[in-house]
Each structure stands twice: as structure tokens, then as C-alpha cells.
Amino acid sequence: MKRQRPQDSMISVPLQNENSTTTPTKEVSHLNFPLKRPRLHSFVPTSKQAALSDITPDTPPAFKTPYSSLPYNLVPQNSSTSKKRPRAEDLLVIEPSQNSLVPSTQNNEWNEIARKRVSLESDHPDKSGQVIDLATGQILDKQTEDIDDDRNKSAVSKSLVRHPHRLKMLPFGIQSAHPYISSLNSNYPTTWHFASHYYPTDSKQLVKYHPTEVHPSWTVEEPVHYNTYDGVVNEPNSSVIIEELDDDYDELNDPMNNNDTPITNSTHSAQMSNLPTHDSMDIDMGGAVPSTST
């Protein structure tokens, strides 16, 4: 039996200027008229539903983008807004291997770690002119030539760096030691403890360390500033000076450096600075600029 559609006369439509309190649904509710349109398969006989199920529905149109007309290989891929800091081309990297002493230039995630270069000058024959990596304790290069002049010996490992922080270390005795880097070489094993000190109000800070012959170790800590009788603040006999240097810093033209001092033959050496005549150690944080030595 077919359903009967409601007659138009049975539906009350309010006039244009008349507020109606009744709705058409109340008038036609006795006819069991569906209020919502039923789904398509409700009106399809069972014999035809199987045939309709074999029909593949149309694919909805894809959202148009500015790159819709470009080939797939030319469409720019989505990337994060935060980009990695580009690694300096002259950054010297050492693989985290205890046996490898050869600098590696492989570009992997480990190489993105900021490096610390250390050059050491000492009267000890096994520690003369060594340049090591603080993160691994491996030797980057070694200067073997003898230096007779004590003035040159104090600054033999000075080098140019791009990083704005540079550390100059001079020996100072303390008793504590903390294992940070061990066994720099087999003849004179040492243990390192490195700590950085940054104070926004100071342009330089002092840090001290000491190698002991009984327990060969190097420890870094912050020393105490003191005044002499003439009112001048002096450094301890050995210390680390953290200099705040701009990216455009020109070490060769620095008035604080002694430009008359000859340049050494070390691979990472540059113009000598006017440092005290003590055993010295320079720690360069960041990538090293190619040497200007001749």
C-alpha cells in the first residue's frame, strides 16, 4: 500500500502579518509523515540494493592548493618552523671513540653538539702544546718544538675563535679533583673537571685549576678576587679568564695583545697575547677560525 502524501489544505500556513502558535508538524502528525528525510537505502528495494552496492562512489574533489598544478617532486614539503643552527664549516669535530685521534667531518646528529677546544702549554714534556677536545679528552694536535722564551711559552696556544666566549687558563693549586676527562695520554694521565661561569654584569671572570704530581689531575673552579696594597685587583698566579668577545672581534688588532710577539708555528696558533709568564692553557669554546700563522 502506498503512502499518502498530506494535502496542502491540511497544513496550516500562517499569514504574513499573523503570528502562529502552531506548526505544520502538529497538523500532520497523525499521518505518520517522516520529519526527516530517511537514508537512501530505506527507499531502495532489497533486490536492487545488491546492485547499488557494487557501484563505486564518486571521489570528492580534493582541496585546491597553490601547488596543485605542480609535479609531486616540486611541491615543497612541510617543515618545522624551528630550523637547526647551521654547523660552522670550520668546526673541528671528534668522534666519541676512545681510540680515534683523527678529526671527523661526518655530518650526523652527534656532530651538532657544541665543541670545546683546549690547548695546553706546560713545562711537562708530555703536555707541551697539546690541543684536546674537552668533550672526549682526545688530542687534536700537538706541538713538539721546544720554546726557550718563557714569554712565548705562556701564550703559545693562543688561537682565533668565532665563539664570543674564550677561556684562558693559568695554573693555580687546589686539592679537590673530579673525574671529567681522564687519560689524556698514557705517560701522564690526567683527570679534568670543567665548569663555566657566566655573570651578566661582569665582562670577565676568573677560574683556577691545578695539576698535581702525586695525583695528576686538573680541576676548574672559581677563585677569590683580592686587592693589593695599591688598590689594584690582581689575578691569582693561575686562572681562567672568560672574555666576552664580539663576533667581529679582531684579535690581531686587539690593543690588549702584544703585537710585537712573534707568531708560533702551531696549527691553531695566532697572534700572541700579553699573558703572565706562567704555564698557561687556553680553552676555546666553539669552532676555530683558520689560523693566520705563517
UniProtKB/Swiss-Prot annotation:
Residues 7-26, 66-81, 255-277 have a biased composition (Polar residues). Coiled coil: none annotated. It is found in: Nucleus. Keywords: Nucleus. Its main location: nucleus. This is Uncharacterized protein PB1A10.05. GO terms for cellular component: nucleus. Residues 1-30, 51-86, 250-294 are annotated as: Disordered. The lineage of its organism: Eukaryota, Fungi, Dikarya, Ascomycota, Taphrinomycotina. It comes from the Eukaryota.
